[in-house]
Amino acid sequence: MGKFDEQKQIDSVNGALALRPQIEELIDRLLAEGVKNLCWLGIGGTWASCMQVVCYLKEHTDMDTFATNAAEYCTTGDKRVGAGTLVVLSSVTGTTTEIVDAVRLAQRHGAKVLGFIDKPDAELATLVDYCISYKGNEQLKFFMVADCFLRRQGNFPDYDTYYAQMDAYLAKDLV
C-alpha cells in the first residue's frame, strides 16, 4: 500500500460527515414545506447506491421512497414524481446526459431536487434546487439524508448518539 494516503482518506470521510448540519437544515425546511416522498435518482453505480438506501429506508419508514434509473425515468416517467417529491442524486461530473434530462423532467413535474455534485461549477449544479458540493463518499451522503428523515419522523431515536460515534470513529476505523 505504498501509495495509499491514510490522512487523505480520513479527511475525506470527516469532510463528508461535516456536511450533516447543512443536510439537517435542508431536510427540516423541506419537511416543513410538505415533502411526502423521496426519489433516489441515478444511473450505473449511482443507481446501485440509490437502491441500497431505498432498501434501508423501507425497513424503517412508511414514507414512500424509491430508486429510479434516470434513463428509464426519461423514457417512461413515474407518476410518483411531482409536487411533494424530493429527488436526491449524486454526480461526479455533473454532466451525465440522462441525469441532466431527468432533473429537468422531475422539476417540470413539480419535484424539488437535491444534488450532491462533486464539481460545483458543473451544469447540473446550476440545475438542481439544492446543491451540496463535496467530492466522494456518495453512500455516506445518501445515508445521512435518509437518517435525517428517519430522525425527524421519530424512527431513529439514537440518531445523536449514532452520529457522535460516526464523527468520533468512522474515518479512522475505515483506514
Describe each PLM feature range:
Residues 1-25, 29-32, 150-164:
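Cofactor-/ligand-binding subdomain signature composed of acidic, glycine-rich
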